[in-house]
Every structure is written in structure tokens, then in C-alpha cells.
């Protein structure tokens, strides 16, 4: 069994049993497996996604900001490496947007909310029947309001109103 598959198996064990040691071991094996999957490896994207998911799960459990920071870094790399017509692009954009919003809620850093807004806007380019598109329409106005509260740009009010109107269609 490869390190990658072992990591995924331990992550599944954690999801079923809730034993934090399983999640810690899964993260250790994900980290090691990634070393054997350089940027040119065809399965690196899957490793990045699953590793980021494990770190986000541990962040949800313990609130350790380093886990969230690393998950964001991994998701950014996954977004960079993904093929042009990657079928799970909207899921990847959504996961990164969620992670950035969580980090913004903790530190109120302008670059986090701005990047999250950019990801929400990219999700608007998804097909109308993609559930992540409608999810983005629901969350974009609040993110724009939060950014406006930080920098006072009135254009965020207009964009937020337009997004809210689209979500009602």
C-alpha cells in the first residue's frame, strides 16, 4: 500500500471513529507521500487536495492556524497545477475560498478577503447548474460588505447588490 493510500485510509478511519491520532497519522503520511509526487507527477493534484482536506479537518477540530495556513498553500498549488478543463475546478475554488474566509475571520487581513472575493467571482463563470455557482452568489455579497468595511470602497456595495440580485434569479 502506498503512503498516499495509507493516508487516505487513516483519514477514513478518523471520519468513522473520530480518533484524532488517526487524523494526525494521516497528515504525516500525506506529507511524506507528497515528497514522492513532484509537480510533474500526474497524481500530485489528488495528493494536494486530500492533504489539504486533512489539514482543514484538523483545523476544524483544534483551531491550529498553521494547519489552515498550510491547507491554503496546498490548495493554491493545486489550483495552479490543475489542468485547463479540470472537472472539479469549482470544488477546488470553493474549498480555497472557504479556507480564506475562515482565516479572514480570524485576522481580518485584506488580502485574504480580496482573494476569497476573486475566487467567488471565478465561480460565477461556472455553468448555471453548478451548485458551487449558486453557493458563490450567496456568499459573495457578504464578502464584499466585509471588504468595504475594511477599506471603504463603495464599488463593493454595487457589486454586492448585483450578486444578491443574481442569486434571486
Language-model features: locations:
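Intrinsically disordered, low-complexity linker/propeptide segments enriched in Ser/Thr/Gly/Pro
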Residues: 2, 9, 127, 143, ...
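Long, intrinsically disordered low-complexity tandem-repeat regions enriched in serine/threonine/proline
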Residues: 1-4, 20-25, 40, 49, ...
